UniProtKB/Swiss-Prot annotation:
Disulfide bonds join 27-140, 42-47, 93-99. Pfam families: E1_DerP2_DerF2 (PF02221). Detected in gallbladder bile. Detected in fibroblasts, kidney, liver, spleen, small intestine, placenta and testis (at protein level). Epididymis. Keywords: Acetylation, Cholesterol metabolism, Disease variant, Disulfide bond, Endoplasmic reticulum, Glycoprotein, Lipid metabolism, Lipid transport, Lysosome, Niemann-Pick disease, Secreted, Signal, Steroid metabolism, Sterol metabolism, Transport. This is NPC intracellular cholesterol transporter 2. Glycans are attached at residues 58, 135.
Length: 151
């Protein structure tokens, strides 16, 4: 029994250690306050994103409003121009958030950032926004990244 408990604890600690808080720029969170942004794996910044890989994104935020729904909008910003960055699940209510969103409640938003093999090897800024049912930002953050062929 002790072995099982120790194994479970070790597994939980190793999973927690893989989530790296990143330094981010708030790009206009209107209806919420970002507590923390984690991108995994991203041990150093700018995050090195390998083509063909997928990265976990976890945003802890507190909502300042009530909202029936939420929608993620992600862009890669190249030389000041936002380019849509498709993600597998844009519905925030299917990404770790139990909707309706309540005022003054803290949430953990979870999603994936897939990096397609056909993306060029470049430096850019990822802008990730979660919009409420009035298209206002529950959160908006930016981080610099570099897309690379292989790490």
């Amino acid at each position: 029994m002790r072995f099982l408990a120790a194994t479970f604890l070790l597994l939980a600690l190793s999973t927690a250690a893989q989530a790296e808080p990143v330094q981010f720029k708030d790009c206009g969170s209107v209806d919420g306050v970002i507590k923390e942004v984690n991108v995994s794996p991203c041990p150093t910044q700018p995050c090195q994103l390998s083509k063909g890989q997928s990265y976990s994104v976890n945003v802890t935020f507190t909502s300042n409003i009530q909202s029936k729904s939420s929608k993620a909008v992600v862009h890669g910003i190249l030389m000041g121009v936002p380019v849509p960055f498709p993600i597998p699940e844009p519905d925030g209510c299917k990404s770790g958030i139990n909707c309706p969103i309540q005022k003054d409640k803290t949430y953990s938003y979870l999603n994936k950032l897939p990096v397609k093999s056909e993306y060029p090897s470049i430096k850019l800024v990822v802008e990730w926004q979660l919009q409420d049912d009035k298209n206002q930002s529950l959160f908006c953050w930016e981080i610099p990244v570099q897309i690379v062929s292989h790490l």
